[in-house]
Swiss-Prot record:
Posttranslational modification: Phosphorylation at Ser-198 by MAPK8/JNK1 increases inflammasome activation by promoting deubiquitination by BRCC3 and NLRP3 homooligomerization. Phosphorylation at Ser-806 by CSNK1A1 prevents inflammasome activation by preventing NEK7 recruitment. Phosphorylation at Ser-5 in the pyrin domain inhibits homomultimerization of NLRP3 and activation of the NLRP3 inflammasome: dephosphorylation by protein phosphatase 2A (PP2A) promotes assembly of the NLRP3 inflammasome. Phosphorylation at Ser-295 by PKD/PRKD1 promotes NLRP3 inflammasome assembly. Ubiquitinated; undergoes both 'Lys-48'- and 'Lys-63'-linked polyubiquitination. Ubiquitination does not lead to degradation, but inhibits inflammasome activation. Deubiquitination is catalyzed by BRCC3 and associated with NLRP3 activation and inflammasome assembly. This process can be induced by the activation of Toll-like receptors (by LPS), through a non-transcriptional pathway dependent on the mitochondrial production of reactive oxygen species, and by ATP. Ubiquitinated by TRIM31 via 'Lys-48'-linked ubiquitination, leading to its degradation by the proteasome.
Effect upon mutating Q603A: Decreased interaction with HSPA8/HSC70 and NLRP3 degradation by the chaperone-mediated autophagy pathway
Impact upon substituting R147E: Impaired ability to activate the NLRP3 inflammasome
Result of altering D213R: Does not affect ability to activate the NLRP3 inflammasome
Keywords: Activator, ADP-ribosylation, Amyloidosis, ATP-binding, Cytoplasm, Cytoskeleton, Deafness, Disease variant, Disulfide bond, Endoplasmic reticulum, Golgi apparatus, Hydrolase, Immunity, Inflammasome, Inflammatory response, Innate immunity, Isopeptide bond, Leucine-rich repeat, Lipoprotein, Membrane, Mitochondrion, Non-syndromic deafness, Nucleotide-binding, Nucleus, Palmitate, Phosphoprotein, Repeat, Secreted, Transcription, Transcription regulation, Ubl conjugation
Glycyl lysine isopeptide (Lys-Gly) (interchain with G-Cter in ubiquitin) cross-link, chain position(s): K324, K430, K689, K878, K927, K973
Domain spans labelled FISNA: 140-210
Gene name as annotated: NLRP3
Name the UniProt record assigns to this protein: NACHT, LRR and PYD domains-containing protein 3
Phylogenetic classification of the source organism: Eukaryota, Metazoa, Chordata, Craniata, Vertebrata
Length: 1036
């Protein structure tokens, strides 16, 4: 039988396989390519099968033809060419027509066996390469997991580490970036719509490289920006670990490579291949195969701000060959500028100080800002840090009581330092002193606990070592140097033995990957020691005479430091100066001298005060955030007498606040400011939605307890703009209003004050000590429910003269309640805005009664409401009353037609107080203007300003208006923009305006196409009558 014959032949071939080859044969049976149409044999059945059983299994599973094809293919795969060629020649003829229908890869004519053998080997080689790549990726992932699964605490003992997954606490990320210029423009235009319409967008780590929408391209470059200690590095390491663990970017990237920018910048010559090799677990990774698909590679470049060479746009020829050796900075610049492996993706971390420079190097990056910990995540971090739950709860409760310190803990580094200090205090049985309000205070406490002398000669040695650290830090800051060699340490009087001690205490961290290089554990610690360099009194024997050292130390003249502060290219000095202010606090100085047995100079206090005076009076300081930055310096000091003297130099304060820290800093400084004349605060709502939920508790907003203790003209002219205010915050803020003797203006526009907050404000406004005269509450989420409270204020507070309630849904019922207070004899309100308050004609009877009874109201703006002709007619009836003192009336976009113009005309002819009338956006038409002009031409009409923009006018009304212009003795401004007056109408105006009897000073026209004759007439008019201004307004 044929079946037996094929099985026997196949068994004989398998019998020729030695034990090793037979095992290989069975292995390939399990991994046989499925695209060849055969069923792989399960290991359980082949493992103990001999050659006969194996042949039978192969035929039973796949049939004779496919079983034979499998055997031939596997003979080639295990490199048994003899059996391959023999089986090819001995292959049975399948089917009645002798056609060979088995796999074409193994079926060919007799004379092409050699050719097929070579082709098959090439195919098997490709399979082997793919398998090898897959195997190497597996090996690389395992290495990355091993490398990044643990982190070392900065105060860890030798060999101690912490699981990254157990310690990591999720950070807030927002898809947000504003250039330096945009930030300045936003600060100068506080409260503008542009600012309000730019809410931040939270983004998850797994979506960083996803397109913005289905029509967009995927993102290839992501920039992580954030302040020092905000968590940029830990986030990058977490990304590496998650990818290697198979939970992140599995479908996007085959390889992630983590690059220390500061380490690479030290290398003189290195290729990208060398750089990739340094990231791999063995010396011979398949580099060629890795870079073959650059789109599947992600480079995580950590610390761009520490790569100084990358700032230089004229760095020289860039590298395009991944095998070519270049300087480290050129190599990274080539990657960033997409000259080297342009298809590869990049994730770059940087401090904001380097962001503007980085922006010029990138093409369409996605900017992501790290905001640190939310309140909930701060609590989570405490419970992860303390292994003992009771300790964690006690520590967190303690920090919650200190608002300032708790708020600072949004920065992960500060959170770690605070936890470390608390844990040390708990373990030693001591309680934490409640004096740590600033970063300086926290660092002083932390460092003093590590540097306590043991007495005797150690005290002298400690001072010498501390001086060495300070000079090393300052030298590094001025030379923008972060990594130091042992020779640098010797030049600053730090011997190798001294460094070992500091390593154990973690003032220095020895870099594992950069042998014989040392760095401060964090950039802020280097900045802290650099500040101390200007305060520590030098040892008598001096340090400038270190044997064999040619070291030239930076100048200790603090004026040199201060002169360079604030310069963009000297941005690295900002934190040094902040720490300097923090360290001259007298109590802090005494504490350090006692703890470290070192002398600290207080002589620079007057120089700092003088510098503040010069900066405060400089005109360029008006460009923010310079003023706020000076407040940060004063806040670090936490010495009220000094701060009060410094704040006397700020008669005008204009700052825009966008972070919690900004709130704290400004609040502290304003509380200590007694001579300010003008205050403008802008509070930007700059938090993702998850943070809004936390704000409902009102915790961080309570820090702004003060707006102004005593000022002669305190105008929060854009104060609290677009801020998320809560009732608890309002009580803290508004309590100041009842104690400030001269705070007269308060703007709370564009925030979520709401009716509850408004009730709190109204309580304060009724206080006898409240001197608010002007109050702006536009877009505050108010309704009719708060109108009774406002009415009580109007009937009791005789100081309030201006009130803006625009863009709040007060409704007709709310206005009825409001009018009760407006008609009260004690109400002195002069100006009232009710624009876009959801009003109808139903409220006009109440408003009209106010017009006829109020002795003070002179300006009423009720535009953007559906009052209609009937509603305006009711108002006009009372406005004709001789007792009506109304001077300005705004009826913009009120749904008016020519029907109401007779009523308006009668007011114009009888009310000599009315000087301004705003009617733009109403379809009055030419007929309406004709009626209006009857009143305007009356001798008793005193109107000075008339706005008729977008009133559906044509050239037909120009005769009536021309007659008005030659006759009116009062009209000075006429606005006719966005009306189709045509050339004929404008030419008519030109003739009239030339006349001496025309007293108009300002004419508004649409910016439209005029013929040559009309343009010439307008030009001639302005030449002949220079006192007349013609304004061309854009057509809507």
């Amino acid at each position: 039988m044929k079946m037996a014959s094929t099985r026997c032949k196949l068994a004989r071939y398998l019998e020729d396989l030695e034990d090793v080859d037979l095992k290989k044969f069975k292995m390939h049976l399990e991994d046989y390519p499925p695209q060849k149409g055969c069923i792989p044999l399960p290991r359980g059945q082949t493992e103990k099968a001999d050659h006969v059983d194996l042949a039978t299994l192969m035929i039973d599973f796949n049939g004779e033809e496919k079983a034979w094809a499998m055997a031939v293919w596997i003979f080639a795969a295990i490199n048994r060419r003899d059996l391959y060629e023999k089986a090819k020649r001995d292959e049975p003829k399948w089917g009645s027509d002798n056609a060979r229908v088995s796999n074409p890869t193994v079926i060919c004519q007799e004379d092409s066996i050699e050719e097929e053998w070579m082709g098959l080997l090439e195919y098997l080689s490709r399979i082997s390469i793919c398998k090898m790549k897959k195997d190497y990726r597996k090996k690389y992932r395992k290495y990355v997991r091993s490398r990044f699964q643990c982190i070392e605490d900065r105060n860890a003992r030798l060999g101690e580490s912490v699981s990254l997954n157990k310690r990591y606490t999720r950070l807030r990320l927002i898809k947000e970036h504003r250039s330096q210029q945009e930030r300045e423009q936003e600060l100068l235009a506080i409260g503008k719509t542009k600012t309000c319409e730019s809410p931040v967008s939270p983004i998850k780590m797994e979506l960083l490289f996803d397109p913005d929408d289905e029509h967009s391209e995927p993102v290839h470059t992501v920039v992580f920006q954030g302040a020092a200690g905000i968590g940029k590095t830990i986030l990058a390491r977490k990304m590496m670990l998650d990818w290697a663990s198979g939970t992140l970017y599995q479908d996007r990237f085959d390889y992630l490579f983590y690059i220390h920018c500061r380490e690479v910048s030290l290398v003189t010559q290195r290729s990208l291949g060398d750089l990739i090799m340094s990231c791999c677990p063995d010396p011979n990774p398949p580099i060629h195969k890795i870079v073959r698909k650059p789109s599947r590679i992600l480079f995580l470049m950590d610390g761009f701000d520490e790569l100084q060479g990358a700032f230089d746009e004229h760095i020289g020829p860039l590298c395009t060959d991944w095998q070519k050796a270049e300087r480290g900075d050129i190599l990274l610049s080539s990657l960033i500028r997409k000259k080297l492996l342009p298809e590869a993706s990049l994730l770059i971390t940087t401090r904001p100080v380097a962001l503007e420079k980085l922006q010029h190097l990138l093409d369409h990056p996605r900017h992501v800002e790290i905001l640190g910990f939310s309140e909930a995540k701060r609590k989570e971090y405490f419970f992860k840090y303390f292994s003992d739950e009771a300790q964690a709860r006690a520590a967190f409760s303690l920090i919650q009581e200190n608002e300032v310190l708790f708020t600072m803990c949004f920065i992960p580094l500060v959170c770690w330092i605070v936890c470390t200090g608390l844990k040390q205090q708990m373990e030693s049985g001591k309680s934490l002193a409640q004096t740590s309000k600033t970063t300086t205070a926290v660092y002083v406490f932390f460092l003093s606990s590590l540097l306590q002398p043991r007495g005797g000669s150690q005290e002298h040695g400690l001072c010498a070592h501390l001086w060495g650290l300070c000079s090393l830090a300052a030298d590094g800051i001025w030379n923008q140097k972060i990594l130091f060699e042992e020779s640098d340490l010797r030049n600053h009087g730090l011997q190798k033995a001294d460094v070992s001690a500091f390593l154990r205490m973690n003032l220095f961290q020895k870099e594992v990957d950069c042998e014989k290089f040392y760095s401060f554990i964090h950039m802020t610690f280097q900045e802290f020691f650099a500040a101390m360099y200007y305060l520590l009194e030098e040892e008598k024997e001096g340090r400038t005479n270190v044997p064999g050292s040619r070291l030239k130390l930076p100048s200790r003249d603090v004026t040199v430091l201060l002169e360079n502060y604030g310069k963009f290219e000297k941005g690295y000095l900002i934190f040094v100066v902040r720490f300097l202010f923090g360290l001259v606090n007298q109590e802090r100085t005494s504490y350090l001298e006692k703890k470290l047995s070192c002398k600290i100079s207080q002589q620079i206090r007057l120089e700092l005060l003088k510098w503040i005076e010069v900066k405060a009076k400089a005109k360029k300081l008006q460009i923010q955030p310079s003023q706020l930055e000076l407040f940060y310096c004063l806040y670090e000091m936490q010495e009220e007498d000094f701060v009060q003297r410094a704040m006397d130099y700020f008669p005008k304060i204009e700052i825009n606040l966008s972070t919690r820290m900004d709130h704290m800093v400004s609040s502290f400084c304003i509380e200590n400011c007694h001579r300010v004349e003008s205050l403008s605060l802008g509070f930007l709502h700059n938090m993702p939605k998850e943070e809004e939920e936390e704000e409902k508790e009102g915790r961080h907003l309570d820090m702004v307890q003060c707006v102004l203790p005593s000022s002669s003209h305190a105008a929060c002219s854009h104060g609290l703009v677009n801020s998320h205010l809560t009732s608890s915050f309002c009580r803290g803020l508004f309590s100041v209003l009842s104690t400030s003797q001269s705070l007269t203006e308060l703007d709370l526009s564009d925030n979520s004050l709401g009716d509850p907050g408004m009730r709190v404000l109204c309580e304060t406004l009724q206080h006898p000590g409240c001197n608010i005269r002007r109050l702006w509450l536009g877009r505050c989420g108010l309704s009719h429910e708060c109108c009774f409270d406002i009415s009580l204020v109007l009937s009791s507070n005789q100081k309030l003269v201006e009130l803006d309630l625009s863009d709040n849904a007060l409704g007709d019922f709310g206005i009825r309640l409001l009018c009760v207070g407006l008609k009260h004899l004690l109400c002195n309100l002069k100006k009232l805005w009710l624009v876009s308050c959801c009003l109808t004609s139903a409220c006009c009877q109440d408003l009209a009664s106010v017009l006829s009874t109020s002795h003070s109201l002179t300006r009423l703006y009720v535009g953007e409401n559906a009052l209609g002709d009937s509603g305006v007619a009711i108002l006009c009836e009372k406005a004709k009353n001789p007792q009506c003192n109304l001077q300005k009336l705004g009826l913009v976009n009120s749904g008016l037609t020519s029907v109401c113009c007779s009523a308006l005309s009668s007011v114009l002819s009888t009310n000599q107080n009315l000087t301004h009338l705003y009617l733009r956006g109403n379809t009055l038409g030419d007929k309406g203007i004709k009626l209006l002009c009857e009143g305007l031409l009356h001798p008793d009409c005193k109107l000075q300003v008339l706005e008729l923009d977008n009133c559906n006018l044509t050239s037909h009304c120009c005769w009536d208006l021309s007659t008005l212009l030659t006759s009116s003795q009062s009209l000075r401004k006429l606005s006719l923009g966005n009306n189709d007056l045509g050339d004929l109408g404008v030419m008519m105006f030109c003739e009239v305006l030339k006349q001496q009897s025309c007293l108009l000073q300002n004419l508004g026209l649409s910016e439209m196409y005029f013929n040559y004759e009309t343009k010439s007439a307008l030009e001639t008019l302005q030449e002949e009558k220079p006192e007349l201004t013609v304004v061309f307004e854009p057509s809507w």
